Regions:
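Glycine/proline-enriched, intrinsically flexible loops and inter-domain linkers
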Residues: 1-183
Length: 183
């Protein structure tokens, strides 16, 4: 399923454009209609043709598309575009499963969203700490440590931002996160 659906091809291209535009341009239907995305049939990014699967259309290739659109703007020169956002999900966005001895070995499974990739720097500011992956771009809810510890047999020892992980430049990407947890 490493093909984007037509909707994901359009929305992630437009998101990459809007991530690079000044804040005074409204993010609404009027602005959206000004962007004309050209798509090709039968391409991994474009309009898929049956029987190709689009099972991971909302992540993976979408993250790379967003990063490439933002990088294309950055290639215009100083003051444009964004650096690339982190791809892939680390230990802070993991799936846990097992049996909870506190509840008569009741089975559980859940994806935790406790920490995330830091965001890319822009010409105007440093990266956002809770950016996530490019297709999320900071628009996700973070789980509560306390509720997670009450709900599942896990304990968080630490969640902290790490020093000297932001890169060089006038504006820096968000710092990395260190997370330690277990049963």
């Amino acid at each position: 399923g490493l093909n984007l659906s037509e909707a994901c091809s359009i929305s992630n291209s437009v998101a990459g454009v809007f991530n690079c535009l000044p804040n005074d341009i409204p993010r609404n239907g009027g602005s959206y209609r000004c962007v004309d995305v050209k798509l090709r049939e039968g391409a991994a990014i474009g309009i898929p043709k049956f029987p190709h699967s689009c099972s991971v259309a909302t992540t993976n290739v979408s993250d790379r598309l967003l990063n490439n659109v933002q990088a294309a703007f950055a290639d215009l020169g100083e003051g444009y575009g964004l650096a690339e956002g982190g791809i892939g999900m680390g230990a802070g966005i993991s799936v846990i499963s097992g049996k909870d001895a506190r509840r008569d070995d009741h089975p559980y499974v859940n994806q935790l969203i406790i920490s995330s990739n830091g965001g890319p720097a822009s010409p105007d500011c440093d990266g956002w700490v809770t950016y996530g992956i490019p297709v999320v771009s900071g628009l996700m809810y973070r789980d509560s440590v306390e509720i997670s510890e009450l709900s599942y047999p896990i304990h968080y020892k630490e969640i902290k931002l790490t020093q000297d992980t932001m890169g060089a430049g006038r504006h820096r990407g968000a710092p990395g996160t260190q997370i330690t947890y277990g049963p």
